[in-house]
Amino acid sequence: MPKKILKGTVVSDKMDKTVVVSVERVFQHPLYKKTIKTRKKYKAHDEENICQLGDMVEIIESSPISKTKRWKVLRIVKEGDTQ
């Protein structure tokens, strides 16, 4: 089975070699047909500490790296606004 790739925004980069990525998913409710947005946060491994707050990144599934990390940063899609 291929590994999942998700796209999201970095919401925290305060940990060493770890970033928190918020992934937004849009789907339609099966019964009421209302469009719903949900967000989920994933901790992702960032080996070189290159990701910054606000960056749009792609993350890929991996084997467990720690207790809560099961994703790795694949690439930075778009750099965020740094102030």
Curated annotation (Swiss-Prot):
Source species: Thermodesulfovibrio yellowstonii (strain ATCC 51303 / DSM 11347 / YP87)
Source domain of life: Bacteria
UniProt-listed HAMAP family: Ribosomal_uS17_B
Record keyword Heme present: no
Quaternary organization: Part of the 30S ribosomal subunit.
A GO molecular-function annotation: structural constituent of ribosome
GO biological process: translation
Function recorded in the entry: One of the primary rRNA binding proteins, it binds specifically to the 5'-end of 16S ribosomal RNA.
Protein known as: Small ribosomal subunit protein uS17
SUPFAM superfamilies: Nucleic acid-binding proteins (SSF50249)
InterPro entries xrefs: NA-bd_OB-fold (IPR012340), Ribosomal_uS17 (IPR000266), Ribosomal_uS17_bact/chlr (IPR019984)
Protein family (similarity comment): Belongs to the universal ribosomal protein uS17 family.
GO cellular component: cytosolic small ribosomal subunit
UniProt key word Ligase: no
Gene3D superfamilies: Nucleic acid-binding proteins (2.40.50.140)
Keyword annotations: Ribonucleoprotein, Ribosomal protein, RNA-binding, rRNA-binding
